Amino acid sequence: MSIRLLCCVAFSLLWAGPVTAGITQAPTSQILAAGRSMTLRCTQDMRHNAMYWYRQDLGLGLRLIHYSNTAGTTGKGEVPDGYSVSRANTDDFPLTLASAVPSQTSVYFCASSD
């Protein structure tokens, strides 16, 4: 790939403009020492009733951690141990790791649906 082509691609991305995400996770990446706690935030602006937290480990498909069918209610998924959630309102569904362990190293996904 020539330098000129690479510059054009970068320039095109700069002019792409903002995109409405609908659902946002934060932080986007995190390195955490064993034994430390942290909260992954998930926010959606689509007024969906249901929200979900999944994890994907190397070589495996998505596995459900916790879910919420409506604000004020939560349920456990396939791999809930070591995690807690809350759902005080329709828009937010934070996932907390109380005391991180190496087996929780994963890619985490938040989702929502009607």
From Swiss-Prot:
What does the subunit comment say? Alpha-beta TR is a heterodimer composed of an alpha and beta chain; disulfide-linked. The alpha-beta TR is associated with the transmembrane signaling CD3 coreceptor proteins to form the TR-CD3 (TcR or TCR). The assembly of alpha-beta TR heterodimers with CD3 occurs in the endoplasmic reticulum where a single alpha-beta TR heterodimer associates with one CD3D-CD3E heterodimer, one CD3G-CD3E heterodimer and one CD247 homodimer forming a stable octameric structure. CD3D-CD3E and CD3G-CD3E heterodimers preferentially associate with TR alpha and TR beta chains, respectively.
Designated gene of the protein: TRBV6-4
**What Gene3D superfamilies does its record include?**
Immunoglobulins (2.60.40.10)
Protein name (record): T cell receptor beta variable 6-4
UniProtKB keywords: Adaptive immunity, Cell membrane, Disulfide bond, Immunity, Immunoglobulin domain, Membrane, Receptor, Signal, T cell receptor
Residue pairs linked by disulfide bridges in the UniProt entry: 42-110
The residues covered by the Ig-like domain are: 22-114
Please describe what this protein does: V region of the variable domain of T cell receptor (TR) beta chain that participates in the antigen recognition. Alpha-beta T cell receptors are antigen specific receptors which are essential to the immune response and are present on the cell surface of T lymphocytes. Recognize peptide-major histocompatibility (MH) (pMH) complexes that are displayed by antigen presenting cells (APC), a prerequisite for efficient T cell adaptive immunity against pathogens.
One Pfam family this sequence matches: V-set
Instruction: Write down the superkingdom of origin.
Output: Eukaryota
InterPro entries the record matches = Ig-like_dom, Ig-like_dom_sf, Ig-like_fold, Ig_V-set, TCR_beta_variable
- Chief location: membrane
> Which residues does UniProt assign to the signal peptide?
1-21
Q: Does the keyword Disulfide bond apply?
A: yes
Q: Name one GO cellular component term.
A: T cell receptor complex
